Amino acid sequence: MDVQIEASWKAVLKNEFTKPYFLEIVTHLKTEKAGGKTIYPPGSLIFNAFNQTHFDKVSVVLLGQDPYHNPGQAHGLSFSVPNGVKPPPSLMNIYKEIQSDIGIAMPAAYGNLTKWAEQGVLLLNAMLTVRANEPGSHQKIGWMNFTDTVIKKISDEKEGVVFLLWGRFAQDKQVLIDETKHQVLKAAHPSPLSAHNGFFGCRHFSKTNDYLVKQGKPPIDWKLLTP
């Protein structure tokens, strides 16, 4: 089947698109939509993370769980929201840690992280879709087979990538990563429920750039400006 995904990723993942589990994902989504269910993000944005960050450009992977499930929030990038949408609490806590870590003031009314994606930060959710107002509703339809493969491909075929694993769910993916040639940084999830248990003070943004510079790669400019 012809999946609308950026060319470098299509080449890397081409074998996945014909596997039974992937065809089942497609069937599941079509069935839910035909039954009147609203699914986020919109179809054209399901692979937005891949379209914004080409495979050869990936230098950081920021792993989320599933897309935001409220109207207008999800646009295919983990933790990110479109222009005009107020940053959710987890993203506000990410901003607080950036300011504490590297002294950059972040825009309280702006949560679009596309600028990070364009620099090589793959903003990957483990599940690429969700039913409206039902968090975790697509956890068992097969997406994790796909995104686990994505993580493994990055680990196997690239070197010197930073994997940011926040919270237990993300940290369970550590087994997919070859830590002899990549950097894994772990912390609590930035959710208000857990940020004080080890996310605040983790300094992952400066640590990421320190590692990238040592690898001879450009550091990430984390600063965001309200358009």
Enumerate the predicted regions with their spans.
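Generic N-terminal amphipathic, Lys/Arg-enriched alpha-helix
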Residues: 1-13
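A polyanion-binding, active-site-adjacent surface
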Residues: 15-162, 169-171, 177-178, 183-186, ...
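C-terminal substrate-binding/active-site "lid" region of AdoMet-derived donor-dependent transferases
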Residues: 199
